[in-house]
A protein has these predicted regions:
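Conserved amphipathic alpha-helical "coupling/scaffold" segments
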Residues: 1-165, 191, 195-205, 235
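Short hinge/gating elements
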Residues: 22-27, 38-41, 180-187, 261, ...
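Amphipathic heptad-repeat alpha-helical coiled-coil/stalk segments that mediate oligomerization
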Residues: 86-99, 144-174, 200-258, 262
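Short amphipathic alpha-helical segments with heptad-repeat character
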Residues: 116, 123, 182-196, 311, ...
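Short helix-capping/linker segments at secondary-structure and domain boundaries
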Residues: 125-138, 210-217, 284-286
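ATPase nucleotide-binding head domains, primarily ABC-like/P-loop NTPase cores
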Residues: 215-379
Length: 379
């Protein structure tokens, strides 16, 4: 699905005040990496039906196992492992034994303490990753999850890592600490970074799973169709504490929804609710609705929060016209689009706004490849 930064801002997918964003409401991640990967997911909608359905399956399975998810992997543990590779070790011995490891502990106590602390966290980290494999291994996995679990199994299959998992972290000898620490530092660096990356992905998708359960989201039925359509019942805006629910149906023979009403009547909220739900559907995520069916859309564009640009000398009305012009050019490609327009031409006087709006609406109605929702108080 094609989407631009303006649309992401209009729908509050991200927001400068984070608590007002969709991202914030979906963010139940436990790690910095998971948070950043969730941000990546929300900024990159999927393009194929196969990807969307596979992601739905991923999230639905994680919803099933969320309460059994291992808690041994923490953000602190991951940070310890990452920073270990940034630290310097003095006169580290590659062949530790009972004598030289004890000497290292005495003469290089600071470095030894770092090694011990890191190895203790590595024990918990590898155990936690193995617990994820054990939790998911016999489940009916999505292609995405199957790929991750297979790779996890391979990374954890190293004999030294298997030994590390079985270690009692509170009773390690100095020689064991140096041996495990040396292996992690000099022979398992890239693998550890890959494990961290995999956990970030799990963390991000698990976050969405928790959000879907918390907010009672449902997974929409989505299918390929040459004719665009959206049908939903009980659809509401996920950012509102006490939302109003809507029913909506758009199809090629009813592809233009024209909203009228006084200011603060809820027109903008309705438009954004439809946009957010359609967008989440194309991320493979659940949506805030009792039920939703829609076609795979090629793009989503909005014209909601237009601003002027003093530096460039561009007026509010000029930017409105440019946004509409660019929108029309994009949707002239014959692909399936959802177009959201709130208060068209509010940057000019009422007489000109009526004339401009009428012209634009008459032109848009001829485009059967797109679904339109347009609001106005000019009626």
């Amino acid at each position: 699905m094609q989407v631009d930064k303006t649309t992401l801002a209009d729908l509050s997918i991200f927001h400068s005040e984070e608590e007002q964003s969709v991202f914030h409401h979906l963010n139940h991640t436990q790690t910095n990496g998971g948070r950043e990967y969730l941000r990546h997911l929300l900024g990159n909608p999927l393009n194929t039906l196969e990807e969307i359905l596979d992601t739905q399956q991923t999230i639905q399975l994680l919803m099933e196992v969320a309460k059994d998810w291992p808690i041994t992997v923490t953000n602190g543990t991951i940070m310890v492992i990452e920073r270990f590779y940034e630290s310097q070790l003095t006169n580290f011995t590659q062949h530790p034994n009972a004598v030289n490891s004890q000497a290292y502990k005495i003469f290089y106590n600071h470095d030894y303490s770092l090694l011990r602390y890191t190895v203790e966290h590595a024990v918990e980290f590898t155990k936690g990753m193995q617990q994820i494999v054990d939790l998911l291994y016999e489940k009916k996995l999505s292609k995405q999850l199957a790929t991750w679990v297979t790779r996890l199994s391979m990374l954890l299959s190293k004999p030294m890592i298997q030994e590390l998992m079985r270690a009692d972290k509170k009773n390690l000898t100095p020689a064991e600490i140096l041996r495990y620490g040396g292996f992690i530092r000099y022979h398992y660096k890239q693998q550890n970074f890959e494990l961290v990356d995999l956990y970030s992905r799990f963390d991000a998708y698990l976050s969405v799973a928790w959000a879907c359960m918390k907010y009672g989201f449902t997974f929409p039925g989505i299918r390929q169709s040459k004719d665009p359509f959206i049908k939903a019942s009980g659809l509401h805006h996920m950012l509102l504490e006490v939302p109003v629910s809507y029913d909506i149906e758009l199809s090629p023979d009813k592809n233009f929804l024209f909203l009228t009403g006084a200011n603060m009547a809820g027109k903008s909220t309705f438009i954004k609710a439809v946009g957010v739900s359609a967008y989440l559907a194309h991320l493979g995520m659940g949506v805030p609705a009792k039920e939703m069916q829609l076609s795979l859309l090629d793009g989503l564009l909005s014209n909601i929060q237009v601003v002027d640009n003093i530096i460039k000398g561009e007026s509010f009305f000029f930017n409105e016209v440019q946004r509409i012009k660019n929108t029309i050019e994009k949707i002239s490609d014959g692909k399936n689009w959802l177009i959201l327009i709130d208060e068209l031409f509010k940057g000019t006087n009422q007489q000109d706004a009526v004339k401009c709006s009428t012209t634009v609406i008459e032109g848009l109605r001829k485009m059967q490849n797109a679904l339109f929702i347009l609001s106005t108080h000019l009626y």
